[in-house]
């Protein structure tokens, strides 16, 4: 995995930890272990790596050792789309756009686990099943 992909994956996963991100550890053969909730993240100085704790396995994993499960924009319900648009108000004066509360709208997408960074098409995340985040 390229360094920029690792960094993007780490940043994305950090933003979703408070909202119960589901991940699967990647086995050495490339297959995935069962999906579990991510517990927390941290930094371990001796290894100089950022890591995530998967409570069920009682182990620490780096971002490139985990595969998050995310929803696509197409998976969003009408209510979720309306809520997203409500949080991301746009004023257009003909030449410029002014976005209000963009951080709030990104937090909302993190909370409902929508892949707005293109991780699924780039093979960095798996598509979540409908039941996964209920």
Residue ranges, per PLM feature:
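Structural boundary micro-motifs
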Residues: 1-134
């Amino acid at each position: 995995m390229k360094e920029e992909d690792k960094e993007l994956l780490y940043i994305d996963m950090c933003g979703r930890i408070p909202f119960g991100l589901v991940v699967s550890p990647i086995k050495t053969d490339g297959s995935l272990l069962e999906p579990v909730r991510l517990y927390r993240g941290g930094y371990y100085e001796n290894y100089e790596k950022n890591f995530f704790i998967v409570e069920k396995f009682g182990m620490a994993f780096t971002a490139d050792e985990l595969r998050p499960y995310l929803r696509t924009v197409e998976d969003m319900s009408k209510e979720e789309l309306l809520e997203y648009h409500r949080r991301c108000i746009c004023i257009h004066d003909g030449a410029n756009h002014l976005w209000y509360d963009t951080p709030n709208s990104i937090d909302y997408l993190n909370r409902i686990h929508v892949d707005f960074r293109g991780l699924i098409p780039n093979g960095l995340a798996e598509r979540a099943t409908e039941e996964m985040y209920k």
